[in-house]
Amino acid sequence: MKTLFFTLLVLSSSLFLGFTNCNSSLYHSAETSLDNYWYQGKAEISRFELEQARYGEIHKGDALMIFVTEDFRTDMQVKLDNEVNKDKAINVMKLNFVREFPTGIYDYSAMTSIFTPIKDYKTERCLKITNSVQEWCGHVFTQLNWQDGKRYNAKSFSYFEADGDKDFELKADYLEDEIWNIIRINPKNLPLGRVNMVTSTLYSRLGHWSLRPIEADALLSVYEGDEFEGEELMEYELIYPEHARNLKIFYENVPPYKIQGFQETYKAPFWKGGEKMTTTAKRTHTILSEYWDKYSLKDRTLREKLGLKE
């Protein structure tokens, strides 16, 4: 039954694109409650128990999602610090998405920052994405900036010869990295059907794939499993036939649309057997905090509230 539902979603993308713009019983109109949640001067910080697929094995670690609203200058594409320039800024949802996990003797640390307009999402695309990955061999950095209302200017810097330093343009319908923010702002805006999608900057780095738009099937259904828990869970899935990869995001269909977890399945390198492996993350803790002021030794107790090691 679930397979049939997925198939209908792909074949009838135009129908579902129309569906996402109407008042469906699947969604709750909650602009006021969302405003009350997001504009209280605090960030939402969630910790996830992470099982990261890497080098043909599963490595345990932590993932963090830090969601916060802030004023963002559209001309410089930076956080507004001076109120004199407020007329040049709009309000955005910022996500700092962190993954930390050890592989053998050395650690991986990755963070992606995503800046998405809130009120003007239909007229403004995701404005900026940055990604950095550090491990003992070296580190890489990627940045995408929305330009001229039609393209992304992309820059990538890498220690690795195969990657090198690059400066290029991207044209695409959507960026995978912005999907997380779309869910939190308004899941009715999620793309459905066959779309052109730029795979995530982290996946591009870990897989040494070029950052470019490829075809993906975007599916939405009510979650029917029991591995993830939450209120009125929905399952959003991106399937990339070219990469034999899929990403599933599980989120609550009640404001503020909390993300309960995700699964990412793809093939291990051929020299590690080439078998499919799955990264899994499950939300364990969430707090609301002005984390930017919590830098004293006495604030380390907040790490325990997040399920993080001292």
Regions found by a protein language model. Give the residues of each.
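Acidic, serine/threonine-rich low-complexity disordered tracts
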Residues: S25-D148, L192-E310
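Positively charged n-region of N-terminal signal peptides that target proteins for export
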Residues: M1-F5
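Bacterial Sec-dependent signal peptides at the C-terminal "C-region" and cleavage site
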Residues: S13-A30
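Hydrophobic transmembrane signal anchors and adjacent membrane-proximal interface regions, especially
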Residues: L15-T20, A43, L170-A172, N181, ...
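Hydrophobic helical h-region of N-terminal Sec-dependent signal peptides
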Residues: F6-S13
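Surface-exposed beta-loop interaction hotspot
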Residues: Q147-L192
